[in-house]
UniProtKB/Swiss-Prot annotation:
Annotated tissue distribution: Expressed in mature pollen.
Protein's name according to its UniProt entry: Fimbrin-5
Species for this entry: Arabidopsis thaliana
Alphabetical list of PANTHER family matching this protein: FIMBRIN-5, FIMBRIN/PLASTIN
Region (Actin-binding 1): 122-370
Segments forming domain EF-hand: 7-74
Region ranges (Disordered): 628-687
Length: 687
């Protein structure tokens, strides 16, 4: 492994806010000031921050002091490095807000890892508010607060308690949140409000939103650029939901051969939308190619051709004959109204080239009339799609997990986007800082196949250094898109990350390795100490399908979080589904960042059961760290009080390393390797 050791931060969310270069720079500033001052306090921060290049004169010392006073009123509080980083983020947010978000444009189109830099204009705000008014107007709880006036800040006030956020997520991806878990009283206390916001943010991650720079406090304070940046992502996911082949098989009409079909399946939804638009424009005689949702649509001509092609019954040449762009845009929107497309944008937005609103408008046209038919001659393309439900479900889980880490590259399809090795290197650098030697990495776009192999060989090399089970696996397997091997690698990577998080809670583990058995033992002991009777023999225990064990575990770590009047006995399939859905929402409400589906619990997916239990364990132990508890919650049966450190260290059964491959890992990789050998017995792999 590279001798370089990155700057480590115990809080993974905080770690994700900075690059290693930024962390090293800030660490150096922190250490030098602490050395110079001896005792580094909140009161010492303003002059230190003012001199940082990151702020470059955008915010002065008095303003910095004002920002810090709101969050940290006691100027005598001593500052540690993580405190220093959090304070830096608070000041940075104020600086960006002051400059009008000049560091970057709105990222409704591009998924940026730096949501703090969103700058939403008033037109976009009005469109998002209109969207909320339209889709949530009949909601039993929210209807008394709607419609919202976009000319006021009422929207930012309404979003503060988290209810609207949760409801909008369920509109975008129905069933994501069990609404029984949402606190919906007229007046919520701070705890209940924070639960809703935590549920909302963790659920946003679970549908594909990038929220690495957004915390519950940001939403509770109603910070406009952060709130609208998140809302825009949720709306984008809703608007593009049908841009895939499972929901719209007729999209195969856009391709001519197998290679085109494979490429289209790997495209981001917005790219598919552009391809769809160009497909119809070409048929309509439009000679240009639309490559973006901004400048290429400014003159309104492409819209006029598109609507004439999709709705010949409303066809008119008036828009095309109109010379003034604004007048043409008006005619386009009038024609769209006849298709029942509610206006996401104004004529001015078209002329100005508002990428976000144009994307939403084109997506809405697609939803109302896509102009495609099922072509029997292309049914073979549909057969290319995986029928393996488990594989599809795992791909979804790993894709969402990777995107939640805040990597620079957004993943739309695991099996396509990871084949050049670059994203895997980004993920490895996130979960094991300093493990990647970037001098040996090839950055996309990569045209030469051997460069992709080099990246993937580096991925395998690092995986072996992290003690993953990678027997007979070579970088070329990833490049070739071996699904089973890739999923097996990603599972080990996710498991390694979770176990490292637990291990890094040194006040509990004393730096000792954590095993799968430790997690199971901890969960069983926790449930027993909570006065409940459920126990799990393993993470394959079929009794887990009822959901009772995890509900009792959640109740044991936080008694108030489970409403037992909503829990079923879990005997029928319907009852199991109700419990499983509730478990996921309650865990997210508690603070667990998880990506499983109810089916994973009902079918007892061993891997997801381990991650769920580990996530609950991590949350529980974090709370003990925060309160600096010195007495173990899991005292031994004879009543002796153990140290908190003993809660984990005394659980060890076999002393195995957390990164040693499990039997399941070996089975997965052996099976995947054998399957590959059947396909290509002559493929030589590196040991």
């Amino acid at each position: 492994m590279s001798s370089y050791v990155g700057v480590l931060v115990s809080d993974p969310w905080l770690q994700s806010q900075f690059t290693q270069v930024e962390l090293r720079t800030l660490k150096s500033k922190f250490v030098s000031n602490k050395t110079q001052l001896g005792r580094f306090t909140v009161g010492d921060l303003p002059p230190v921050f003012e001199k940082l290049k990151a702020f470059n004169g955008t915010i002065d010392e008095d303003e910095i002091k004002s920002v810090l006073d709101k969050s940290y009123p006691n100027a005598d509080d001593e500052v540690d490095f993580e405190f220093f980083l959090r304070a830096f983020l608070s000041v940075q947010a104020r600086g960006v807000e002051k400059s009008g978000g000049s560091k970057g444009a709105s990222s409704f189109l591009k998924t940026s890892t730096t949501t703090v830099h969103h700058a939403i204009n008033e037109s976009e705000k009005a469109s998002y508010v209109s969207h909320v008014n339209n889709y949530l107007r009949d909601d039993p709880f929210l209807k008394s607060y709607l419609p919202i006036d976009p000319a006021t800040n009422a929207f930012f006030d309404l979003v503060k308690d988290g209810v609207l956020l949760c409801k909008l997520i369920n509109v975008a991806v129905p069933g994501t949140i069990d609404e029984r878990a949402i606190n919906t009283k007229k007046t919520l206390n701070p705890w209940e409000r924070n639960e809703n916001l935590t549920l909302g943010l963790n659920s946003a991650k679970a549908i594909g939103c990038t929220v690495v720079n957004i915390g519950t406090q940001d939403i509770a304070e109603g910070r406009p650029y952060l709130v609208l940046g998140l809302i825009s992502q949720i709306i984008k996911i809703q608007m593009l939901a049908d841009l895939n082949f499972k929901k719209t098989p007729s999209l195969f009409q856009l391709v001519d051969d197998t290679q085109d079909a494979e490429e289209l399946m790997g495209l981001a939804p917005e790219k598919v939308l552009l391809k769809w638009m160009n497909f119809h424009l070409k048929k309509a005689g439009y000679e240009k190619q639309v490559t973006n949702f901004s400048s290429d649509l400014k003159d309104g001509e492409a819209y006029a051709y598109l609507l004439n092609a999709l709705a010949p019954e409303h066809s008119t040449h008036v828009a095309l004959e109109t010379k003034d762009p604004t007048e043409r845009a008006k005619k386009v929107l009038e024609q769209a109204e006849k298709l029942d497309c509610k206006r996401y944008l104004s004529p001015k937005d078209i002329v100005d080239g508002s990428a976000n609103l144009n994307l939403a408008f084109v997506a809405q046209i697609f939803q109302h009339r896509n102009g495609l038919t099922v072509d029997d001659s292309k049914t073979s393309f549909a057969e290319m799609m995986t029928d393996d439900v488990e594989t599809s479900r795992e791909e979804r889980c790993f894709r969402l997990w990777i995107n939640s880490l805040g990597t620079a590259t957004y993943v739309n399809n695991v099996f396509e986007d990871l084949r050049n090795g670059w994203v895997l290197l980004e993920v490895l650098d996130k979960v094991s800082p300093g493990s990647v030697n970037w001098k040996h990495a090839n950055k996309p776009p990569i045209k030469m196949p051997f460069k992709k192999v080099e990246n993937c060989n580096e991925v395998i090399k690092i995986g072996k250094e992290l003690r993953f089970s990678l027997v007979n696996v070579a970088g070329n397997d990833i490049v070739q898109g071996n699904k089973k091997l890739l999923l097996a690698f990603l599972w080990q990577l996710m498991r390694y990350t979770m176990l490292q998080l637990l291990r890094n809670l040194r006040s509990h583990s004393q730096g000792k390795e954590i095993t799968d058995a430790d997690i199971l033992n901890w969960a069983n002991r926790k449930v027993k100490r909570g006065g409940r009777t459920s126990q799990a023999d393993s993470f394959r225990d079929k009794n887990l399908s009822s959901g009772m064990f995890f509900l009792e575990l959640l109740s044991a770590v936080e008694p108030r979080v489970v409403n037992w009047s909503l829990v079923t006995n879990g005997e029928t399939e319907e009852d199991k589904k109700l419990n499983a859905t509730y478990i996921i929402s309650v865990a997210r409400k508690l603070g667990c960042s998880i990506f499983l589906l109810p089916e994973d619990i009902i079918e007892v997916n061993q891997k997801m059961m381990l991650i769920l239990a580990a996530s609950i364990m991590y949350w529980s132990l974090q709370q003990q760290s925060d309160t600096e508890s010195t007495v173990s919650e899991d005292a031994t049966d004879d009543g002796d009080a153990n140290s908190v450190a003993g809660e984990i260290s005394n659980l060890s059964i076999d002393g195995a390393s957390e990164s040693s491959p499990t039997v399941q890992d070996q089975e997965l990789l052996t099976k995947a390797d054998n399957d590959e050998d059947e396909v290509d017995g002559e493929n030589n792999k590196d040991a």
